[in-house]
Amino acid sequence: MQIFPAIDLKNGQCVRLFQGDFSKKTVVNEDPIAQAKAFATDGATYLHIVDLDGALEGRPINLEVIQKMKITAKIPVQVGGGIRSMAQVDYYLESGIDRVIIGSAALTDPDFLRAAVQKYGAKIAAGIDAKNGFVATRGWLDVSQVSYLDLAKRMEKVGVETIIYTDISRDGTLTGPNLEQMANLKEHVKVNLIASGGVSSRADLEALAQLGLYGAIAGKALYNHHISMSDIVEVEQIAY
């Protein structure tokens, strides 16, 4: 299972949120470029980067910093946050980003998602963020009446190969991932699934790996030292 250390960017700094609440923000490193390099040096093989400013503004805000992170870390990166037009997708991918995550627009603008998938294939991932099972958009500020599973099935029909699923109620809480929802997704859609939100320990990563998922994202647990990079490297090597 691929495990992605997460770097969330706000005002040019690495931060962590609690349950997606921008007022409950903790700065974990003032230098995201150094953080990206540190993860790579310690064995990370793929980074998950979210432009939180971009998610709020609806356009990429931290492009220059993200490019420098990619160049410095010298490993693949996937990026999400505020990607709502083909021009933005083009810019990221043409600047060397390996995969872009279309979040809010996956729900609000399915034609855009379809066009991006047709043009770039596996370089496009869909991000599904849900609260109590319903999809949230616009930096998690708006909650829709669409269930996470219904949207995942739509994404699969469009040709999306990778879905990143975040349970907002668990994000940044260290309460454990939502194994039930991940198992439900695994049963009903045949795409690469990446779990995000709530990972608190090596045991959580192992439990996700046992579901047969493609990947998992580790954020707060890494910064709080509940999980080490050596844990991540070791769990990635285990065959379940």
UniProtKB/Swiss-Prot annotation:
It comes from Listeria monocytogenes serovar 1/2a (strain ATCC BAA-679 / EGD-e). The gene is hisA. The active site is at D8 (proton acceptor), D129 (proton donor). Its EC number is 5.3.1.16. NCBIfam families: 1-(5-phosphoribosyl)-5-[(5-phosphoribosylamino)methylideneamino]imidazole-4-carboxamide isomerase. Pathway: Amino-acid biosynthesis; L-histidine biosynthesis; L-histidine from 5-phospho-alpha-D-ribose 1-diphosphate: step 4/9. Keywords: Amino-acid biosynthesis, Cytoplasm, Histidine biosynthesis, Isomerase. It catalyses: 1-(5-phospho-beta-D-ribosyl)-5-[(5-phospho-beta-D-ribosylamino)methylideneamino]imidazole-4-carboxamide = 5-[(5-phospho-1-deoxy-D-ribulos-1-ylimino)methylamino]-1-(5-phospho-beta-D-ribosyl)imidazole-4-carboxamide. This is 1-(5-phosphoribosyl)-5-[(5-phosphoribosylamino)methylideneamino] imidazole-4-carboxamide isomerase. InterPro entries: Aldolase_TIM (IPR013785), His_biosynth (IPR006062), HisA_bact_arch (IPR006063), Isoase_HisA-like (IPR044524), Isoase_HisA-like_bact (IPR023016), RibuloseP-bd_barrel (IPR011060).
